[in-house]
Amino acid sequence: MPDYKVYYFNVKALGEPLRFLLSYGNLPFDDVRITREEWPALKPTMPMGQMPVLEVDGKKVHQSVAMSRYLANQVGLAGADDWENLMIDTVVDTVNDFRLKIAIVAYEPDDMVKEKKMVTLNNEVIPFYLTKLNVIAKENNGHLVLGKPTWADVYFAGILDYLNYLTKTNLLENFPNLQEVVQKVLDNENVKAYIAKRPITEV
């Protein structure tokens, strides 16, 4: 079995889908949580000077979605063929587009600009994406694609706390089908065990 390490700050955010996937598949991994003080010295050792980073048998790789896709293949959550993988990728990329649209507003440094962008985000962007995804979940029996568990479900469940933090809301409050998607992931015994022992963090 490969030796896995996940390098990230002591937050959920983009690192949590990786931790969820490894946990889902019951693959042991070192959860290396870097402090802000440690980061400057470690930054040059990372492929692109950023995290999260996945290390597999001493080889470091970056890009959270690519790493998640790789882990999905290791834990049996990838598609059965190229078409199924395409279907999964379209959903994951949609979720990631949603994340980026939220992040652009959340990290806007100009308060006046941010206030205007928040109106569009809350009134248009968030309802659009969540309504679409909620319908997809209903059509797929409480999953995001293919009517069965895939890494799209785990990626979404893993990133959700971060999105709630950025928007300061409970995004899924009015979207029961998406709640079902997340709950199915959280009900996995291995994910449940990971959550029980992970550090408590705000984000």
From Swiss-Prot:
Enzyme nomenclature, EC number: 2.5.1.18
Record-annotated residues binding glutathione?
8, 39, 43, 49-51, 63-64
Say which domain of life the source belongs to. Eukaryota
InterPro entries cross-referenced by the UniProt entry: Glutathione-S-Trfase_C-like, Glutathione-S-Trfase_C_sf, Glutathione_S-Trfase, Glutathione_S-Trfase_N, GST_C, GST_superfamily, Thioredoxin-like_sf
Keywords (alphabetical) are:
Transferase
Q: Where is the GST N-terminal domain?
A: 2-79
Record's keyword annotation contains Transferase: yes
- Among the Pfam families in the record, one is GST_C_3
Domain GST C-terminal per the UniProt entry, residue ranges: 81-203
Catalytic reaction equation(s)? RX + glutathione = an S-substituted glutathione + a halide anion + H(+)
UniProt-recorded Gene Ontology molecular function terms: glutathione transferase activity
Q: Which GO terms describe its biological process?
A: glutathione metabolic process
Q: Which residues form a coiled coil?
A: none
The similarity comment for this entry is: Belongs to the GST superfamily. Sigma family.
Q: What does this protein do?
A: Conjugation of reduced glutathione to a wide number of exogenous and endogenous hydrophobic electrophiles.
PANTHER family according to UniProt: GLUTATHIONE S-TRANSFERASE, HEMATOPOIETIC PROSTAGLANDIN D SYNTHASE
Q: How does it assemble?
A: Homodimer.
Q: What is this protein called?
A: Glutathione S-transferase
